Amino acid sequence: MKKLLALFLALVLTLSLAACGKPGSTQSGVSGDVAEEDRYGGHVDFVLDFKPGNLDPAKSTGLWAYTFTSMIYEAPLTRDAEGNIRPNVCDFELSDDQLTLKLWVRDGVTFHDGSAVEIEDVIASIRRSVHKSPRQFVAPYIKDVVIDDDGVATITFTEYNEKTMYYIACVNPFIGVMPKEIAEKYSYESKNFIIDVADAIGTGPYKVTEFITEVAVSMARHEGYKAVEEGYTGFAAPKKAYLDSITFYYNTDDSASCIGMMNGDYDLKSGAGDYEASFITSGLTKYEKLSNTGDMINFNTHEDTIIGRSADMRKAMIAAIDWVEYFGINNTVVDGKGVNPALDGKYATDVFAKAPYFVTDGTNVETSKKYQEAAGYKGEEIKLVINSGLVTEITALSGYWKAAGINISIQNMESAAFTEYYGEKSNVWGLRYQWPSLNNSPTLLSGTIMTDTYSTPEKDKLYGELSSMIAGSDEYMAKWQELAQQMVDDCAVVFMKQTKLTWWSHPDMVFEYDGLTPYLFNAYWRNPSEHGVK
């Protein structure tokens, strides 16, 4: 039973896979047979279903929605596949109590305009912290900054908060390093975000050449890019800009973008929708890679509905799901170590495996009805709000709920409308099915999960105490056990799995990465001369 529950609750921080495959096959990382000097060149047209409204790393922060920002900007520090802090724009020293951080710019790091990155640029970028979360957890915690004659900045923090270092050393470029004058021009006080190509200056492997709002972002290789050469994994691995240029096209019509992919209008696409068989027939190559997102059910415990009032009703909905069967239907479920909502064995706890509403013995309907009776459920409608990209998963789940006599209505929304809808407290929704970001510890799961929909005075207190403890310490782990038990008792948030992303490409394209998603650093054409701008 525990093995099945562990599968249900599995969330793997990252998995480094490598395999070779033929066109039309599934691959999870490819090692090419092309010499290094022959890889450079060619153009890629990449189609995504998110529309870019700006070029600001503090605004366009989603790893999957705004792929281009991670190509342009880099945070001062980053994380490897195991969540360890690693050099990026800067090298560093961090004290054991994490109250003192020393940063210095790595030798040879330059901006896209060719100017050398100075430590003053890094500090200005950190202080900028325009995005709401870094604004809350970085700038206010900086007590003092001293820069010595050797270009070493010593940052002293007022107190420990795990989120402070999370945002300074993050795979998302929330704090993208930019020239000091740009950081000051687009300060928080200015209320402006970067939309001008001339001001979109970062340190990443590619630089912006053209931006058409809500249409496309084009970029070219940053010839002066200085990669970290140490053999780290994940986003800390060496990044190479092999391609001459890239254009990110944004097309929210999935059918049109799939047809365009088969016609050769695009070279790379995320997901195939209903066109997977056609993609394979067309000779396109499928890549699969674990992401840092997962699938999650988040109940609305604030609204005056039966879902909000009753933990038993929430448990009834989880009990109704036949997880063993669901795993068989949904092949994106990942087997691995770890339990909800921890990301690796370090934070594993058997609290979740002991929860009586995770049913694996086939008595799902009976168990659900017992919880429904305890909740006093009389068939009231429960509104389910979902992101349009999750229709397949939610169709399977809603069948279980209906079989158990739970009255579900589904509201399907595009991503932007979805976020806006559930963020407005006046809207009544029973639960939402979404993609949460998976970070490096229980404390960092999500402010929305832990301090908003999921909030109670008791959990707020525990969460605050966890945030002030060094993650992974003995006292942290003891407090985490308390919070995990409250999460089970409340059943307000249930992680279902870590998500596999699927990417489809022209068969001549090669991705080389170690713990990286198929971003276009480290990607190249086997025959670059055959892949110019269309």
State what each model feature region is:
Residues 47-96, 104, 127, 201:
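N-terminal lobe/hinge region of extracytoplasmic solute-binding protein
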Residues 212, 216-217, 318-350, 389-398, ...:
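Detector for C-terminal structural segments
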Residues 118-125, 152-154, 204-205, 242-244, ...:
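Alpha-helical secondary-structure segments
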Residues 81-84, 172-245, 255:
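Gly/Pro-rich hinge or "lid" segments in bacterial periplasmic/extracellular proteins
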Residues 206, 333-374:
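Structural transition elements
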Residues 91-135, 148, 154-159, 307-309, ...:
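Aromatic- and charge-enriched surface segment that lines or borders ligand/interaction sites
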Residues 137-186, 205-212:
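Surface-exposed binding/hinge segments that line
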Residues 227-279, 407:
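Ligand-site clamp/hinge motif
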